[in-house]
């Protein structure tokens, strides 16, 4: 993971969503915490190109995300409500959907679908309908759909939100075992407690960039 923020900021008219930020992001696990409306999601959307900077630029693995010719295929995004990003009713069909747009052969698609499900021990989900899945199973299905396309960087937005203890533990194990670089946006402080680097956002600016223990302490000061 090599992400460079070069005085990158976002404004909507007079409202500043994210103050200009200069930051280098490398490594395997980055936590992102902050109160609602602090700029966390805007920060993440700049990385995958869903939001364009109004000042400065963001470079992901050597490519400017603001360039209209650039498709940020290096970045996969798991939204806070994974059921909303699963498009097709059957899990294996949804995983295949993103691969068909890559121009892969039928055999290649089938191999990737089987491979990504096996990676998470989720073969039993292949023929299940998305609306029948538990919260944890939905997270796994969404992860499979994104990871099948081969992104090197994964952004997870509130991955344990509204999960029971069993499904929360499942998602925690998956995140811990991901070989891909991961940026985890969360209010769940236990989830990022072991991370070497955590970013804290407050009122549209970066308030702290520290190891987890120090960053969590700073967040608690802000939230008090």
From Swiss-Prot:
<feature type="domain" description="ABC transporter">
    <location>
        <begin position="3"/>
        <end position="224"/>
    </location>
</feature>
<comment type="function">
    <text>Involved in biotin uptake.</text>
</comment>
<keyword id="KW-1003">Cell membrane</keyword>
<protein>
    <recommendedName>
        <fullName>Biotin transport ATP-binding protein BioM</fullName>
        <ecNumber>7.6.2.-</ecNumber>
    </recommendedName>
</protein>
<feature type="binding site">
    <location>
        <begin position="34"/>
        <end position="41"/>
    </location>
    <ligand>
        <name>ATP</name>
    </ligand>
</feature>
<comment type="similarity">
    <text>Belongs to the ABC transporter superfamily.</text>
</comment>
<dbReference type="GO" id="GO:0043190">
    <property type="term" value="C:ATP-binding cassette (ABC) transporter complex"/>
</dbReference>
<keyword id="KW-1278">Translocase</keyword>
<dbReference type="InterPro" id="IPR027417">
    <property type="entry name" value="P-loop_NTPase"/>
</dbReference>
<keyword id="KW-0997">Cell inner membrane</keyword>
<dbReference type="InterPro" id="IPR003439">
    <property type="entry name" value="ABC_transporter-like_ATP-bd"/>
</dbReference>
<dbReference type="InterPro" id="IPR003593">
    <property type="entry name" value="AAA+_ATPase"/>
</dbReference>
<comment type="subunit">
    <text>Part of a biotin transporter complex composed of BioM, BioN and BioY.</text>
</comment>
<keyword id="KW-0067">ATP-binding</keyword>
<dbReference type="GO" id="GO:0016887">
    <property type="term" value="F:ATP hydrolysis activity"/>
</dbReference>
<keyword id="KW-0813">Transport</keyword>
<keyword id="KW-0547">Nucleotide-binding</keyword>
<dbReference type="InterPro" id="IPR015856">
    <property type="entry name" value="ABC_transpr_CbiO/EcfA_su"/>
</dbReference>
<dbReference type="InterPro" id="IPR017871">
    <property type="entry name" value="ABC_transporter-like_CS"/>
</dbReference>
<dbReference type="Pfam" id="PF00005">
    <property type="entry name" value="ABC_tran"/>
</dbReference>
<dbReference type="GO" id="GO:0042626">
    <property type="term" value="F:ATPase-coupled transmembrane transporter activity"/>
</dbReference>
<dbReference type="InterPro" id="IPR050095">
    <property type="entry name" value="ECF_ABC_transporter_ATP-bd"/>
</dbReference>
<dbReference type="GO" id="GO:0005524">
    <property type="term" value="F:ATP binding"/>
</dbReference>
<keyword id="KW-0472">Membrane</keyword>
